Amino acid sequence: MAQGTLYIVSAPSGAGKSSLIQALLKTQPLYDTQVSISHTTRAKRPGENHGEHYFFVEADEFKRMIQDSEFLEHAEVFGNYYGTSRPAIEQVLATGVDVFLDIDWQGAQQIRAKMPQARSIFILPPSKEELARRLRGRGQDSDEVIARRMSQAVAEMTHYGEYDYLIVNDDFDLALLDLKTIIRAERLRLSRQKIRHDALITKLLAD
């Protein structure tokens, strides 16, 4: 069976990364594509389920996993740990399922160092003005917070050149099509097709 592909997807806040991934998953069967589920030490919130939203673990268990090098990447955010389990990812990839990992550029660097075969995608907004409009449209932040987010977004976008693919999310449907096209092209790579169609190729080349 051909291995699945790990896709690292990064973008500044407001570029539409999460929306694109969720829209993609709705069009792909579960046995083809899944989203990575992180481990965390934070408390479970109402409506969240273990193994669906996060893998909820105690701090001691998380630290043990760090010591045993079980994480592709991990970080501490506001006193809670978050991390991506390498064994969990590899187990899914071994079944031929593609895995999408929504992560920032710093986490992406950590993962590429440990899994260079992963494919990475960066998503850009069509303009700074549109990015600011989307952030304001959420109605959650003050002008001061939005200005800070915009400054952070510019810093994040300077890392686009570290990625394999670049998508500009101006028209959502077109950006989603671009994302699907990347997946389709990766699945047609010779290394995967040789395994997938091994029996056919053997018959075609038999004397």
Swiss-Prot record:
Keywords: ATP-binding, Cytoplasm, Kinase, Nucleotide-binding, Transferase. It catalyses: GMP + ATP = GDP + ADP. This is Guanylate kinase. PROSITE patterns: GUANYLATE_KINASE_1 (PS00856), GUANYLATE_KINASE_2 (PS50052). It is found in: Cytoplasm. Essential for recycling GMP and indirectly, cGMP. PANTHER family: GUANYLATE KINASE (PTHR23117:SF13), GUANYLATE KINASE-RELATED (PTHR23117). Residues 4-184 form the Guanylate kinase-like domain. GO terms for cellular component: cytosol.
